[in-house]
Amino acid sequence: MILKKTSLPKVVKNILLDKKEPISLVHFVTNRCNARCSFCFIDFDDPKTFSHELTLDEIDVLTKNLGNSLLNVNLTGGEPFARKDLVDIAKKYLVNTTIQSIYVTTNASLPDRIKNFAEEVTAFDNQVELTFQISIDDMPDNHNRVRKVKNLFDKCIETYRLLKRMGDNINPVVSI
């Protein structure tokens, strides 16, 4: 990775000596999700589950206090694309930190939102690397059954293909 917003000596010093600033961050942006996976740890029956999401203003404050060594953020959840302000969240990280890559863990059920996110974020910063982690659990029927979403397997494939055509700095990956 070529460092664009910070220097290699600074990052190495932070990792090996100072250990003051994160270089990678997992940001759980929401508990909301349109799937109801049988293995999920989110308690969808608890009314408190969907409260306490950070607001965009709170994320602005957070990102301004992460230091100058952050290279990557993983936006995850629930389903991150359940948040309609996910592009704005990504922009906060791009403006306020030194990130060079954004990793999004998704069930790939919302291909239009995912495509829009990729287009808007790369238009905002054409140097950022975007990786979309798409999980496939089984063959189509079992995948859909376990996640309790009709045709989700097909949407995963559709989303993967859509992202694959979008550009060199957009990387769809599938975990099986």
Model-derived regions, located:
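Noncatalytic linker/hinge segments flanking ATPase motor cores
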Residues: 68-72, 115-120, 141-151, 170-176
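Glycine-rich S-adenosyl-L-methionine
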Residues: 147-165
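Short flexible/disordered coil segments
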Residues: 54-57, 133-145, 167-172
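Extended hydrophobic secondary-structure segments that form protein cores and membrane-embedded regions
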Residues: 74, 105, 131-137, 173-176
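Residues within well-formed alpha-helices
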Residues: 89, 155-158, 171
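Conserved strand-turn element in the central/C-terminal portion of the radical SAM core barrel
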Residues: 104-105, 160-176
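Conserved radical SAM core fold
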Residues: 80, 108-112, 133-149
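Conserved alpha-helical substructure of the radical SAM core
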Residues: 2-129
